[in-house]
């Protein structure tokens, strides 16, 4: 497997609409204010988080069960700044819609700006021929409330091209998160 460059990413966007909307270069300023950067980088793409969040709460005294997830574990918010309570968790989604080629696996890593504040971003790999908005998982590991800024950079996607095309893609096996829109909760 090889990690793919900015040139390859740009061509995949032009020829296959791999990322929409697409920022051709790093955006660091918006409306004369510094922001957490997003857009194309040397060997990856920094994606933005939308203003749609689901924040974990204990107001309903439920339990988190991945096989029987209770939507009442969360409160929905559409905000420019999401406040994650201390030692808590929130879900968001990318502004960008991704369409992954059959010979590519995508890995997500967090932005250092958030990591240095104790905010960890987790995303499972984007598999060959998966498409949709990416649901982002934010963990606030600090004993203090933490801010996530909507429409600014949240994570970086790295594109790994396989030496061979896979026999069975995410689309072939009709994966349960195929073509997800918005923040998607656990499915079994």
Curated annotation (Swiss-Prot):
Q: In the UniProt record, does the keyword Hydrolase occur?
A: yes
One example of the protein's molecular function in GO is: dCTP deaminase activity
Q: What is its EC number?
A: 3.5.4.13
* Annotated active site: 137
InterPro entries registered for this protein in UniProt: dCTP_deaminase, dUTPase-like_sf, dUTPase_trimeric
Cysteine pairs forming cystine bridges in this chain are none
Q: What does this protein do?
A: Catalyzes the deamination of dCTP to dUTP.
Family the UniProt entry places it in: Belongs to the dCTP deaminase family.
Q: What is this protein called?
A: dCTP deaminase
- Origin species: Rickettsia bellii (strain OSU 85-389)
Kindly list the organism's lineage: Bacteria, Pseudomonadati, Pseudomonadota, Alphaproteobacteria, Rickettsiales
């Amino acid at each position: 497997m090889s990690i793919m460059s900015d040139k390859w990413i740009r061509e995949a966007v032009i020829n296959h609409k791999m990322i929409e909307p697409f920022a051709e270069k790093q955006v660091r300023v918006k409306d004369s204010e510094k922001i957490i950067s997003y857009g194309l980088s040397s060997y990856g793409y920094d994606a933005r988080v939308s203003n749609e969040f689901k924040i974990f709460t204990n107001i309903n005294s439920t339990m988190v069960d991945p096989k029987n997830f209770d939507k009442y574990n969360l409160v929905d918010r559409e905000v420019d700044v999401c406040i994650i309570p201390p030692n808590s968790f929130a879900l968001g989604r990318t502004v960008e819609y991704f369409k992954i080629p059959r010979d590519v696996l995508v890995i997500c890593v967090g932005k250092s700006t958030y990591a240095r504040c104790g905010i960890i971003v987790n995303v499972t790999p984007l598999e060959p021929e998966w498409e949709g908005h990416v649901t982002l998982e934010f963990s606030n590991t600090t004993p203090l409330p933490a801010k996530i800024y909507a429409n600014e950079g949240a994570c970086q996607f790295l594109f790994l091209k396989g030496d061979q095309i896979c026999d069975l893609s995410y689309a072939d096996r009709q994966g349960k998160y195929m073509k997800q829109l918005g923040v998607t909760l656990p499915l079994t």
